[in-house]
């Protein structure tokens, strides 16, 4: 956004900040009280309006708890879902709702973590109550609240807040002047801050220094690209991972930061010959997908999209079938925590009172002796 335009929005940003801070003060002074869940709660959220890599981090936290023997439950708002109220997306055995009913990211989390309970609820408290009632005989070990830093109605044992390294933290401003939903100083509420999407440590240095000065535990991470998964043909059966190198592709997506998707593909060796992007969570139409398929056919390109977009289309098989006559792939991504991983794991362990077993000392073999 240009400087004159930002200045024009500044009065509205100041008004929005005043409203947000008034509400926060009501919680800080216990005028509004946070409800205590019967299960420990971990919140994964952010300060800005999307694009921080929050969903992959939720996925990482869920997988970590599963790896150490705990059963987590995820509660998400289910952004842009078509269902209403509180809905059970997965019971920890079966995925019960489509991406249209659950929301793109929530459906993706459910499919990628079949052992986790997943619920969508506009009011997260109602989601906790559904879990408590439905799974009274086997309560989950921990509740993971997706995108809940601003949702202070539920008390939490751990607040993890993500900051996008691609957006200079020093220059960040409140909506609508910038992308912040809360002032930067509110990071003091966080138990752990994750500076995510770091691609260049030198470029991220100003943000790192600013965050370190706030005195909160800081974790550094980047998004690591994983496999290219083929979903053409039978959309319910995924083939073996593809080799990205030398693929000529038409990239399409509906995400907050599509340019980072293209960069990831190019980094993996994909030749991106054409692109088509829509706004985050925008619906695909049959007309649009036919146009994408036609252009890809004319240019001899395969189709590549994001994992989130794949799961969005999976809930609409009539749309998915339009493109699957061509080779189609989606790109998996995951957080690569390269600094502070042990710290984050320690914080997550404390929530569920988990004490890792110490590694046995390595046996030192004596040198062979001749007698």
Curated annotation (Swiss-Prot):
GO terms for molecular function: ATP binding; tetraacyldisaccharide 4'-kinase activity. Pfam families: LpxK. GO terms for cellular component: plasma membrane. SUPFAM superfamilies: P-loop containing nucleoside triphosphate hydrolases. ATP binds at residues 48-55. Keywords: ATP-binding, Kinase, Lipid A biosynthesis, Lipid biosynthesis, Lipid metabolism, Nucleotide-binding, Transferase. Its EC number is 2.7.1.130. GO terms for biological process: lipid A biosynthetic process; lipopolysaccharide core region biosynthetic process. It catalyses: a lipid A disaccharide + ATP = a lipid IVA + ADP + H(+). It is an enzyme of class 2 (transferase). Pathway: Glycolipid biosynthesis; lipid IV(A) biosynthesis; lipid IV(A) from (3R)-3-hydroxytetradecanoyl-[acyl-carrier-protein] and UDP-N-acetyl-alpha-D-glucosamine: step 6/6. Belongs to the LpxK family. HAMAP family: LpxK (MF_00409). PANTHER family: TETRAACYLDISACCHARIDE 4'-KINASE, TETRAACYLDISACCHARIDE 4'-KINASE, MITOCHONDRIAL-RELATED. Transfers the gamma-phosphate of ATP to the 4'-position of a tetraacyldisaccharide 1-phosphate intermediate (termed DS-1-P) to form tetraacyldisaccharide 1,4'-bis-phosphate (lipid IVA). This is Tetraacyldisaccharide 4'-kinase. The gene is lpxK.
């Amino acid at each position: 956004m240009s400087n004159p335009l930002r200045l024009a929005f500044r009065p509205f940003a100041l008004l929005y900040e005043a409203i947000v801070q008034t509400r926060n003060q009501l919680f800080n002074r216990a005028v509004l009280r946070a409800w205590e869940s019967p299960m420990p709660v971990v919140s994964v959220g952010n300060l800005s309006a999307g694009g921080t890599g929050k969903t992959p981090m939720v996925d990482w936290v869920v997988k970590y708890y599963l790896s150490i023997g705990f059963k987590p439950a995820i509660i998400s708002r289910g952004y842009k879902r078509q269902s209403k109220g509180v809905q059970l997306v997965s019971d920890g055995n079966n995925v019960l709702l489509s991406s249209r009913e659950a929301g793109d990211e929530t459906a993706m989390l459910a499919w990628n973590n079949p052992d986790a309970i997943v619920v969508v609820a506009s009011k997260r408290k109602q989601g906790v109550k559904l879990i408590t009632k439905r799974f009274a005989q086997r309560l989950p070990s921990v509740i993971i609240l997706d995108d809940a830093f601003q949702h202070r109605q539920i008390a939490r044992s751990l607040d993890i807040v993500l900051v996008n390294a691609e957006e200079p933290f020093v220059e960040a401003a409140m909506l609508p002047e910038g992308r912040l939903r809360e002032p930067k100083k509110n990071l003091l509420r966080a138990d752990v801050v994750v500076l995510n999407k770091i691609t260049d440590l030198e470029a991220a240095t100003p943000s790192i220094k600013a965050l370190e000065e706030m005195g909160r535990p800081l974790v550094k991470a980047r998004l690591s690209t994983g496999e290219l998964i083929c979903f053409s043909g039978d959309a319910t059966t995924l083939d073996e991972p593809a080799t990205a190198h030398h693929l000529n592709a038409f990239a399409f997506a509906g995400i907050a930061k599509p340019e980072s998707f293209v960069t990831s593909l190019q980094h993996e060796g994909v030749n991106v010959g054409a692109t088509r992007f829509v706004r985050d969570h925008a619906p695909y139409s049959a007309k649009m997908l036919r146009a994408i398929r036609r252009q890809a056919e004319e240019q001899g390109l395969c189709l590549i999209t994001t994992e989130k977009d794949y799961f969005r289309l999976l809930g609409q098989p009539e749309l998915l079938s339009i493109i699957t006559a061509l080779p189609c792939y989606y790109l998996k991504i995951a957080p690569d925590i390269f600094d502070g991983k042990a710290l984050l794991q320690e914080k997550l362990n404390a929530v569920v009172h988990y004490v890792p077993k110490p590694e046995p000392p390595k046996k030192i073999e004596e040198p062979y002796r001749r007698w």
